[in-house]
Amino acid sequence: MNLKQMVGIEAAKYVEDGMIVGLGTGSTAKFMVDEIGRRVKEEGLSIVGVTTSKETEKQALALGIPLKSIDEVPYVDLTIDGADEISADFQGIKGGGAALLFEKIVATYSKKCIWIVDKSKMVDDLGAFPLPVEVVPYGSRQLVHLFEEKGYHPTLRLNAAGETLITDGGHHIIDLHLEKITDPEALGSYLDNLVGVVEHGLFLNMVSMVIVGYEDGPKTLHVPAR
């Protein structure tokens, strides 16, 4: 069992009968969704899933997990998702899988969020992983120029075919290569106020628990209340 599978299975233990569960996206979240699907089938676990991408929706439906959209539920009890980086003070960068907008919407309306990662994702400071910024296609080149002038080293994300990537929401992604983010809240606020920016991959003050995979087993970190 690899570290991603280990934390995915561990996180699925927190899912209880009757819950509305946000199902994350990505290589680690995939194992969590598989385990929830197994529990639905083998244990009779009764939940409703809310997916964060078309990719996860397809996986969950194939596993027989009942689904509703975020607009069909009053709230989400628990969201479990991966992360690309988690800092020492439990702030995160997400969006390497291009699902950041829907992931952030589901997380925002969740009572509790668990992030599942292998040990390599735990860092002192955010920024070594490129920061995704989801933008409206119209005017996106202007934002690239703006970010270049700011010294953010932007790149427009491409898909496997080498064409401009289109997100599930119909947007583009500009990745910012920042190396180190000294003030995530200030940067997040700046990006929030830019015309044409739909969302960014800074997930600040959102997570309740982090499950980290190590060779000797998963370690659960409880995030202090903010």
Swiss-Prot record:
The keyword Isomerase applies. Substrate binds at T25, G26, S27, T28, D81, G82, A83, D84, K94, G95, G96, G97, K121. Signal peptide: none annotated. Its EC number is 5.3.1.6. The lineage of its organism: Bacteria, Bacillati, Bacillota, Bacilli, Lactobacillales. Homodimer. The keyword Transmembrane does not apply. Belongs to the ribose 5-phosphate isomerase family. It is an enzyme of class 5 (isomerase). The gene is rpiA. Catalyzes the reversible conversion of ribose-5-phosphate to ribulose 5-phosphate. PANTHER family: RIBOSE-5-PHOSPHATE ISOMERASE. This is Ribose-5-phosphate isomerase A. One of its GO terms (cellular component) is cytosol. Pathway: Carbohydrate degradation; pentose phosphate pathway; D-ribose 5-phosphate from D-ribulose 5-phosphate (non-oxidative stage): step 1/1. Keywords: Isomerase.
